[in-house]
Amino acid sequence: RLLKEGKMTNIISTCCPSVNDLIEKYYPKLVPMMAPVVSPMAAHGRLIKSIYGGDVKVVFLGPCIAKKEEAIGDERVRGAVDAILTFEEITKWWSAQGIDIHQCEDQPAGNPDPGVNQLYPISGGVIQSVLAGTDEGHYYKVHIDGLKNCMELFEELEKGEIQDCFFEVNVCEGGCIKGPASDKWRQSLVRAKMDIEKQV
């Protein structure tokens, strides 16, 4: 909708809580460029509670430690998610319980096939999946990842010389898939990206 309306000078994605904090604390002039939408974690949590009732507990599993602060420290999303476990914490939990995931039987999740939306956690995944096939109006789509690159972009945006762009921005290089609690030492970025893209 935001892209079709075309009212914003630039649009900065608000999926990454580290990006949101960075802008709000160090680049406050750019706050009007932030997409006025909650993160996918918050949106999904709210959707689950609207379908199954307010007394259901939602637990988010992922590679991002910043999501913990988002869930408890950001008034805009408070209550959407009840607990957050990182992949690292889950792995340690399984180990403490003597669970070897490789010995477990595969079970289908029973959810609808997410299709291209599985690309979301890799750099450029929002553009490739969520915005794929949408009318982007006059906006040029760009994805930026890595803290240094994000800061360079924000400095350029503060100068006011860049217009009519949609920026998908992630602090983690490679996107969420390479988050700090993703067991990243076990898999290269290229391998992680290939594994996700093969599933689509």
Q: Model-derived features: where do they sit?
A:
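Iron-sulfur-associated redox domains of electron-transfer enzymes in respiratory
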Residues: R1-V200
